[in-house]
C-alpha cells in the first residue's frame, strides 16, 4: 500500500491520474464529459473552491499595488507576430479565429497576453511618473494542446489563468518586482498547503521572449512533477518590439523593462493531489467551501436533536464559520460521513440525543479522523483551534513528503535509477547548455533548472555528463506533466 503525507493510505495513487479523475468527478468538483478535447466543466462545488482561491490571489495582488484589468480574448495577429521568439514559442499552440464571411483580419485566441498588453502600455505610459505599472487579470487562455489532455492539469482552455504584467523604469526595479512576485506565489502556495520547489529554468526551457524564467514545481503522488507557477523577467525584449518608451527624469526617452507571471487551476489540482487520500479530498480549512458539516443523528420524529444542531450551526455562522447542516432524512449518518469526507470538509460536527442531554457536540478531524467531545459553550473556539491545527498539520506533512522525494546523485546512471522511482533528482552541472541537454538525454528526464530555494552548490564535483567540466550548479531533474 502506498502512503502519502500524514501516513494516510493511498493505494489508488499507484495510478494517480485514475485516482485524480475519479475523486474530482465523485466529489462534484469537475466534469470532464464535455465533448471537446481539453475543455471541461466546473461544477458548483468546484466553482466555490475556485472562488475562494481566486479571492486569495486577488487579495495578495491588490495588497502589493497591482490593479485588476480585463482584456479582450482576441489578439490581432499583427501584435502577436511582432516578437519573433515569442511567436516561435507559441505559434504551434494557438487557436486561430476565422470570420464566417471570409474576411482578411486574422485573430488569435490569447495563449497569454504579453502581446495584447504592450500596445496598451504604449498608450498608458508617458513618463517616469507612470511607472511602475502593475496590472493583472484572471481569464481564460487557449492552447492547442497536441499532447494527451488531463482534467485540470493539461487543458486547451485554461479557464483560471491569473496573469500579471508589470512595467518598470530599469532592470533593478523590474527584478525587485520578480522577487516580489516570487514572494506572492510563496504565500499562495503556503496558504493552500502546497509544497514547492523554486528553480531558474534552463535557457532552453525559459518562456518565449523572456530573459529568464523562475518556476514553481510540486511533486505529484506518482513521482512526476507539475509546474504550478512561473515568473518571467522580460527585459526590454517586448518594449523594443512595440516601441514602448517613457520620458525619464534625465529628460531622455528610455525603453521600459517588463515582467510577467502566471498561475492557473493547476494550483487547485495540486492542492487536491498532494493532500487527498483514498477517502477523497482534504481541503485547507480557510479555502474549503464548507468548513464544518453538522450531522444531526435523529431517531423517529423527535425534533430536539435537529433544533439543537441548527442552534449550534447558527452560533458558528455568527462567528464567521462556513457551516452546513445535513438534515436529510433519506440518508443514514454513515452515508453522510462518507459523502462529506469525499468532499474534503475539514471538520464534522455530530449531534445525537446524548449530546443534547450533555449540552455538548462531537468534532471529527478530516485529516486524522480524531474525535473530540466539546462543550457547546466552547464550540466556536474549539472549531477555530481545530481548523488551525488541521492546516498546520497539512502543511507540515506535505512539506515533509516533498523533501523526502528530492535526492542527489553525482552520476547519470544512478540519477536515472532514482528518477525511475519518482521524485526529483539533483545532479552536478557546469551550466553548459549542451551538457545539460546531454544529462536530460542520458537520464530520460526533464530539467527543472537551478535551485533558487537553497544556496548550496556542488563542491569539487564534475558535470554529470561532461566530466571534463567543473560543476557550478545543481541541476534539478524530473519526469513531468
Swiss-Prot record:
The record lists the catalysed reaction(s) as:
tRNA(Pro) + L-proline + ATP = L-prolyl-tRNA(Pro) + AMP + diphosphate
Location of the protein in the cell: Cytoplasm
Q: Which InterPro entries match?
A: aa-tRNA-synt_IIb, aa-tRNA-synth_II, aa-tRNA-synth_II/BPL/LPL, Anticodon-bd, Anticodon-bd_dom_sf, Pro-tRNA-ligase_IIa, Pro-tRNA-ligase_IIa_arc-type, Pro-tRNA_ligase_II_C
Q: Which Pfam families match?
A: HGTP_anticodon (PF03129), ProRS-C_1 (PF09180), tRNA-synt_2b (PF00587)
Would the keyword Aminoacyl-tRNA synthetase be found if you checked this record's keyword annotation? yes
Report any one BP term from Gene Ontology. Answer: prolyl-tRNA aminoacylation
Report the main location listed first in the record: cytoplasm
Q: What are the GO cellular component annotations?
A: aminoacyl-tRNA synthetase multienzyme complex; cytoplasm
Q: Which HAMAP family match?
A: Pro_tRNA_synth_type3 (MF_01571)
NCBIfam families given in the database record:
proS_fam_I
How it assembles, according to the record, is:
Homodimer.
Tell me, in a sentence or two, what this protein's role is.
Catalyzes the attachment of proline to tRNA(Pro) in a two-step reaction: proline is first activated by ATP to form Pro-AMP and then transferred to the acceptor end of tRNA(Pro).
Q: What is this protein called?
A: Proline--tRNA ligase
Organism, as annotated: Caldivirga maquilingensis (strain ATCC 700844 / DSM 13496 / JCM 10307 / IC-167)
Amino acid at each position: 500500500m502506498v502512503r502519502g503525507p500524514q501516513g494516510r493510505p493511498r493505494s489508488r495513487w499507484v495510478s494517480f491520474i485514475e485516482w485524480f479523475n475519479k475523486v474530482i468527478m465523485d466529489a462534484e468538483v469537475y466534469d470532464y464529459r464535455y465533448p471537446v478535447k481539453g475543455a471541461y466543466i466546473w461544477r458548483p462545488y468546484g466553482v466555490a473552491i475556485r472562488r475562494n482561491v481566486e479571492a486569495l490571489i486577488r487579495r495578495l495582488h491588490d495588497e502589493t499595488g497591482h490593479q485588476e484589468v480585463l482584456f479582450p480574448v482576441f489578439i490581432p495577429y499583427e501584435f502577436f507576430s511582432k516578437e519573433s521568439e515569442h511567436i516561435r514559442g507559441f505559434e504551434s499552440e494557438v487557436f486561430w479565429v476565422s470570420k464566417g464571411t471570409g474576411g482578411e483580419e486574422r485573430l488569435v485566441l490569447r495563449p497569454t497576453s504579453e502581446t495584447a498588453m504592450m500596445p496598451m502600455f504604449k498608450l498608458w505610459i508617458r513618463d517616469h511618473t507612470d511607472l511602475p505599472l502593475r496590472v493583472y487579470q484572471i481569464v481564460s487562455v487557449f492552447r492547442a494542446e497536441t499532447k494527451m489532455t488531463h482534467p485540470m492539469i493539461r487543458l486547451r482552455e485554461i479557464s483560471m489563468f491569473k496573469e500579471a504584467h508589470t512595467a518598470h523604469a530599469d532592470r533593478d526595479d523590474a527584478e525587485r518586482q520578480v522577487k516580489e512576485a516570487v514572494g506572492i506565489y510563496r504565500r499562495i502556495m503556503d496558504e493552500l498547503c502546497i509544497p514547492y520547489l523554486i528553480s531558474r529554468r534552463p535557457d532552453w526551457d525559459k518562456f518565449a521572449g523572456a530573459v529568464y524564467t523562475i518556476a514553481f514545481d510540486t511533486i505529484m503522488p506518482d513521482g512526476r512533477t507539475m509546474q504550478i507557477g512561473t515568473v518571467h523577467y522580460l527585459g526590454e525584449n517586448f518594449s523594443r518590439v512595440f516601441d514602448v518608451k517613457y520620458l525619464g527624469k534625465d529628460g531622455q526617452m528610455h525603453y521600459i523593462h517588463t515582467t510577467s507571471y502566471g498561475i492557473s487551476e493547476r494550483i487547485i489540482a495540486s492542492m487536491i493531489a498532494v493532500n487527498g487520500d483514498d477517502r477523497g479530498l482534504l481541503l485547507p480549512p480557510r479555502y474549503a467551501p464548507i468548513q464544518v458539516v453538522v450531522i444531526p443523528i435523529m431517531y423517529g420524529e423527535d425534533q430536539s436533536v435537529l433544533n439543537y444542531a441548527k442552534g449550534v450551526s447558527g452560533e458558528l455562522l455568527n462567528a464567521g464559520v462556513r457551516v452546513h447542516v445535513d438534515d436529510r432524512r433519506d440518508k443514514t449518518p454513515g452515508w453522510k460521513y462518507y459523502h462529506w469526507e469525499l468532499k474534503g470538509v475539514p471538520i464534522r460536527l455530530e449531534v445525537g440525543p446524548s449530546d443534547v442531554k450533555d449540552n455538548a457536540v462531537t468534532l471529527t478531524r478530516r485529516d486524522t479522523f480524531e474525535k473530540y467531545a466539546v462543550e457547546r459553550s466552547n464550540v466556536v473556539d474549539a472549531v477555530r483551534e481545530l481548523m488551525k491545527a488541521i492546516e498546520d498539520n497539512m502543511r507540515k506533512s506535505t512539506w515533509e513528503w516533498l523533501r523526502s522525494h528530492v535526492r542527489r546523485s553525482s552520476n547519470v546512471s544512478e540519477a536515472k535509477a532514482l528518477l525511475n522511482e519518482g521524485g526529483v533528482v539533483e545532479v552536478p552541472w557546469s551550466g553548459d547548455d549542451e551538457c545539460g541537454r546531454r544529462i536530460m538525454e542520458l537520464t530520460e528526464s526533464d530539467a527543472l533548472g537551478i535551485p533558487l530555494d537553497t544556496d548550496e552548490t556542488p563542491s569539487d564535483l564534475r558535470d554529470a555528463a561532461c566530466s571534463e567540466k567543473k560543476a557550478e550548479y545543481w541541476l534539478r531533474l524530473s519526469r513531468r506533466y
